[in-house]
A protein has these predicted regions:
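Alpha-helix C-terminal capping/helix-to-coil transition sites in glycosyltransferase folds
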Residues: 5-7
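Predominantly a Rossmann-like dinucleotide-binding segment in NAD(P)-dependent oxidoreductases
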Residues: 60-63, 67-183, 191, 197-203, ...
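Short beta-strand scaffold segments in enzyme catalytic cores
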Residues: 189-193, 234-236
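Aromatic-enriched alpha-helical interface/lid elements that frame and gate functional surfaces
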Residues: 233, 239-254
Length: 254
C-alpha cells in the first residue's frame, strides 16, 4: 500500500536482508526510485531479477554501503592506485566478531508481539512459527533471513579492495570453516579468493589472492598489538610496503 502512494518519489529499503529484493521490486514496479541498503539481495537469482527490473523500468537506483562515502576509504584508494606501496601482491580482510554458529531453536509456543505482523516480516520465506530469536539483530545468524558475518559485514570491508583494485568476479574461491549447517551461518570462516589480472587507472595489475577471515584473527599477518589497535580491517601487501585500514583510519607499514 505504501508504494502505491502517488506522492512518493523514492523508497529506501533498510529491512532485514531476506526482504530487500521483494521490497525493491515492489517499489520499482510502482514507478518509484530505490535506494537499497547492502547487501542488495540474498541470492544470485534475486540479484538478477532486481537488476533486470531496474533496466526495464529505468528507475534511479543505488545500493547503500555507508562507509564508502567517507574520506578515509577514498584516501586509501588514492594511495593504492598511485603506487604508494608498489604492485599489490595480496590482500587480507578480517572481522574479529561473528554472527552465526547457532543451533536451530526448539519450537515452543511463543506469542507474536502485538506490534509485529509476523507474516509480513517473513515475506518470501516459507511459513514458520514465530520465535524472538529470529527477529531484531539475531536474524543475521540464519540462512533464511541473512548470511552471517560475511554477508553482513563483509560488504563494508570488502568494498575497499574491490574499489581500490577494481576487482570483479573471482576466478576461484576456497572456503574453510566448521561443518556446514543447513540453518545457521558459520561462526568462523576463512575464504581465499583468486582474482584475475586487470587494468586499473591505465596500469596493468597482475592476478592476486584476497583472503577473508571472520571469527578468528589472522595471526600470521599481524601482531597481537596490531590486532588490538585495529580490530577489524584490511591489509594491502605491496611490493614496496603495506597499507592497513579500517573504517576510520589507515597507516602505511614497512
Amino acid at each position: 500500500k505504501l508504494v502505491e502512494q502517488k506522492d512518493l518519489d523514492a523508497v529506501v529499503v533498510a529491512t532485514p536482508d531476506h526482504t530487500h529484493a521483494v521490497a525493491s521490486v515492489a517499489a520499482m514496479r510502482a514507478g518509484k526510485h530505490v535506494y537499497c541498503e547492502k547487501p542488495l539481495c540474498r541470492t544470485i537469482s534475486e540479484v538478477r531479477h532486481v537488476t533486470d527490473l531496474a533496466r526495464e523500468t529505468n528507475r534511479v537506483t543505488q545500493m547503500g554501503t555507508q562507509i564508502h562515502a567517507g574520506s578515509n576509504y577514498r584516501r586509501v584508494v588514492e594511495l593504492v592506485r598511485s603506487g604508494a606501496i608498489g604492485e599489490i601482491n595480496e590482500v587480507h580482510v578480517w572481522v574479529g566478531s561473528s554472527t552465526g554458529g547457532r543451533t536451530r531453536y526448539q519450537q515452543f509456543p511463543a506469542s507474536v508481539p502485538g506490534n509485529l505482523d509476523w507474516d509480513l516480516w517473513l515475506g518470501p520465506i516459507p511459513e514458520q512459527p514465530y520465535h524472538p530469536g529470529w527477529t531484531h539483530f539475531h536474524w543475521r545468524h540464519w540462512w533464511h533471513f541473512g548470511g552471517g558475518t560475511l554477508a553482513d559485514i563483509g560488504c563494508h570491508y570488502m568494498d575497499l579492495p574491490f574499489w581500490a583494485l577494481d576487482l570483479s568476479h573471482a576466478t576461484s574461491a576456497e572456503a574453510e570453516g566448521p561443518p556446514v549447517d543447513k540453518d545457521s551461518a558459520p561462526i568462523w570462516l576463512k575464504v581465499r579468493y583468486q582474482f584475475p589480472d586487470r587494468v586499473v587507472s591505465g596500469r596493468h595489475w597482475k592476478a592476486l589472492p584476497l583472503t577473508w577471515y571472520h571469527g578468528r584473527y589472522p595471526n600470521h599477518i599481524l601482531t597481537p598489538e596490531q590486532h588490538k589497535r585495529w580490530g577489524s580491517g584490511i591489509l594491502f601487501v605491496g611490493s614496496k610496503g603495506q597499507l592497513i585500514s579500517n573504517y576510520g583510519g589507515h597507516e602505511l607499514l614497512p
